[in-house]
Amino acid sequence: MERVNVVGAGLAGSEAAWTLLRLGVPVRLFEMRPKRMTPAHGTDRFAEIVCSNSLGGEGETNAKGLLQAEMRRAGSLVMEAADLARVPAGGALAVDREEFSGYITERLRGHPLLEVVREEVREIPPGITVLATGPLTSEALAEALKRRFGDHFLAYYDAASPIVLYESIDLTKCFRAGRYGQSADYLNCPMTEEEYRRFHQALLEAQRHTPHDWEKLEFFEACVPVEELARRGYQTLLFGPMKPVGLVDPRTGKEPFAVVQLRQEDKAGRMWSLVGFQTGLKWPEQKRLIQMIPGLENAEIVRYGVMHRNTYLNAPRLLGETLEFREAEGLYAAGVLAGVEGYLESAATGFLAGLNAARRALGLPPVAPPEESMLGGLVRYLATANPEGFQPMYANWGLVPPVEGRMGKKEKRQAMYRRGLEAFSAWLSGLNPPLPRPEAALV
């Protein structure tokens, strides 16, 4: 059987390759790192996490929780790795990034049907191919896509939060708590009104890195840099990453005027990231601003925030709900390139693209999950959204049909969760050939 090409070994590409391998389809996995690195990556590992280490909230009231459950049912390698590399994060699924990517890399590299090619792909390969090149798609491949399909690209700039060393945090000025008395997995640095005023002003005056091109900045709303939020108004941060609602300072018995939250990044608890503080500021400015935060005056920064370009397709113009290009049989897109936002969403689209690439290789028709499932709702959005001003999408309850009947918000979401997982499970059970259990892919 001819090998299927998977271009890019991020979360989407890794999941696509794994799905193909589980169905007995040989895979040629292209990854340009380490021969050519990106501005955001630091290793040559597959599924390297370069932004937050959280795969989203868990539970039956959370849309990402439903997508997580669907992926577990599907035998996802990414979910298998996430469950093994989990670190405490309250109601969210967060991972130790080194353990996570290391596990996925070893699982894939050990499979006898996988060929790994460490080189940049500059043209669309012939044959059945999954493109999962991520937000930092190389210029050469982007140009090849434009020549093939027209100028249907959009671009915005993602930003990642700084990480500080736990032992350098002054814990006498912070308190552990989750909002509304939930699990105390977060460190909270409270600010008075005067401290916030000075911090906000410093953000407005801070120098940013100059982008590599002069295109208009189009930020995805879930990943707006903190300095951009500050520019939107004095109170914007107070209703965003610095909101104090539901956090009571035990020293005062009151909610602070503002708060900066830190979340554990690794299993050992040595590294903590500033939640919602994605930034593209120059590094000396980041250090100055972080040290204005109570408790972080002497913080040791182990990773500065970075800003990098994100390239993605105008999915409604180019892709169907099976993630196959409408004008190119046997060519699929997955992950951020396909127009989704988030680690889990990238992996989920990688699963579906890999599944349909395998079915084409086996001479079978393509499939798409039911609309009640979160993955089904997500890919239908990609295929049917308004192409004018198209923006990346992440898992949310607006992607699936509402349930009927009078019930509270919590009960309604729980009902949507149960309905979606049941529909997805039934869809999986009806696949022919069936997806082997994850253990069947072990070697």
UniProtKB/Swiss-Prot annotation:
The keyword NADP applies. InterPro entries: FAD/NAD-bd_sf, MnmG-rel, MnmG-rel_CS, MnmG_N, TrmFO. FAD binds at residues 8-13. Pfam families: GIDA (PF01134). One of its GO terms (molecular function) is tRNA (uracil(54)-C5)-methyltransferase activity, 5,10-methylenetetrahydrofolate-dependent. GO terms for cellular component: cytosol. It catalyses: uridine(54) in tRNA + (6R)-5,10-methylene-5,6,7,8-tetrahydrofolate + NADH + H(+) = 5-methyluridine(54) in tRNA + (6S)-5,6,7,8-tetrahydrofolate + NAD(+); uridine(54) in tRNA + (6R)-5,10-methylene-5,6,7,8-tetrahydrofolate + NADPH + H(+) = 5-methyluridine(54) in tRNA + (6S)-5,6,7,8-tetrahydrofolate + NADP(+). It comes from the Bacteria. GO terms for biological process: tRNA methylation; tRNA wobble uridine modification. PROSITE patterns: GIDA_2. It is an enzyme of class 2 (transferase). Catalyzes the folate-dependent formation of 5-methyl-uridine at position 54 (M-5-U54) in all tRNAs. NCBIfam families: gid_trmFO (TIGR00137), PRK05335.1 (NF003739). This is Methylenetetrahydrofolate--tRNA-(uracil-5-)-methyltransferase TrmFO. It comes from Thermus thermophilus (strain ATCC BAA-163 / DSM 7039 / HB27). The lineage of its organism: Bacteria, Thermotogati, Deinococcota, Deinococci, Thermales.
